[in-house]
C-alpha cells in the first residue's frame, strides 16, 4: 500500500499568498494542482492581483523537484490557445496580461514555460492509502482525443452543468476529484474541491480524507 501523502489543491486563480499558506501547513505532502492556478477573478476582495509568472514559477519549481504535478486547466490552456493571436484579438484581460509578462522573458525562458505547460497532463491517477484517485480539472477522460480535449478542460456544457450529469460519466470504482466549478461538492465518489466563489482555495488531504478551505 502506498502511504505517500497527497495534497490536492483546487483553483488558485493567482492567489499566491494563499498558496504560501497552504505550502507552509502541508510541507510533507506531494502536491496535485488541479488547474486554473492563474488569472485573478475581478470579484476577489481578499487578495491582490500578482504576476502570473510568480505563481507559475513557484509551481514549476515544485514540479521539477518531483514534489508536485500540475494538471492543466482551462486558464493555463488560454495561454497556449491565444499564444499566436494579436493582442487586440484576445478577449480576456487577464490572458493578455499573462502573455505580456511572457513576452518580457528571454526566448529560452519563454520556451521553457511553454514546453512545461504543453507537457502537463490533463488527467492524473494515483494510489494513496489503498484508494485510487482520479483527478482532472473539469471532466475525467484519460483517453482524450483532440476532439474531446475541450471537455476535459472545461466540462460538459461549458461553463456550467448539473453535477448529476458529471456523475453519469464516472465509474463506481475510484475517487474522482475536480476543480473548475466554483463551489465545493461532495457526493459518493465524486468530489469538487474548487472554492473560488467563496474567495477561497479548496484543499483535500488524502491521508486523513479531510477537505479544508484556505483564505
Question: Which residue ranges define each predicted feature?
Answer:
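Active-site environment of divalent metal-dependent phosphoester hydrolases
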Residues: 13-18, 39-42, 75-81, 141-143, ...
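Conserved beta-sheet core of the metallophosphoesterase superfamily
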Residues: 158-215
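N-terminal active-site segment of His-dependent metallophosphoesterases
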Residues: 1-54
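Active-site neighborhood of phospho(di)ester-bond hydrolases with catalytic His/Asp-centered motifs
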Residues: 9-10, 31-35, 69-74, 135-136, ...
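Active-site neighborhood of divalent metal-dependent phosphoester bond hydrolases
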Residues: 40-126, 130-131, 158
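Beta-strand-turn-beta hairpins that frame and shape the catalytic cleft
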Residues: 1-7, 126-134, 188-189
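Active-site-proximal segments of metal-dependent phosphoesterases and phosphodiesterases across multiple
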Residues: 140-170
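A general structural motif
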Residues: 3-4, 26-30, 65-67, 131, ...
Amino acid at each position: 500500500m502506498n502511504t505517500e501523502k497527497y495534497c490536492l489543491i483546487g483553483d488558485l486563480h493567482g492567489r499566491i499568498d494563499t498558496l504560501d499558506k497552504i505550502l507552509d501547513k502541508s510541507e510533507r505532502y506531494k502536491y496535485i494542482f488541479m488547474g486554473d492556478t492563474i488569472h485573478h477573478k475581478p470579484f476577489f476582495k481578499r487578495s491582490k492581483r500578482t504576476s502570473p509568472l510568480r505563481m507559475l514559477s513557484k509551481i514549476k519549481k515544485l514540479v521539477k523537484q518531483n514534489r508536485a504535478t500540475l494538471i492543466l486547466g482551462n486558464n493555463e490552456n488560454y495561454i497556449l490557445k491565444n499564444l499566436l493571436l494579436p493582442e487586440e484579438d484576445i478577449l480576456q484581460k487577464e490572458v493578455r496580461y499573462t502573455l505580456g509578462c511572457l513576452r518580457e522573458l528571454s526566448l529560452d525562458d519563454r520556451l521553457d514555460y511553454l514546453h512545461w505547460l504543453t507537457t502537463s497532463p490533463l488527467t492524473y491517477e494515483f494510489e494513496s492509502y489503498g484508494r485510487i484517485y482520479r483527478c482532472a480539472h473539469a471532466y475525467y477522460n484519460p483517453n482524450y482525443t483532440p476532439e474531446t480535449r475541450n471537455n476535459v478542460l472545461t466540462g460538459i456544457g461549458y461553463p456550467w452543468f448539473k453535477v448529476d450529469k458529471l456523475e453519469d460519466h464516472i465509474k463506481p470504482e475510484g475517487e474522482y476529484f475536480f476543480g473548475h466549478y466554483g463551489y465545493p461538492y461532495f457526493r459518493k465518489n465524486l468530489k469538487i474541491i474548487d472554492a473560488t466563489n467563496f474567495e477561497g482555495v479548496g484543499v483535500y488531504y488524502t491521508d486523513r480524507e479531510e477537505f479544508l478551505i484556505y483564505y
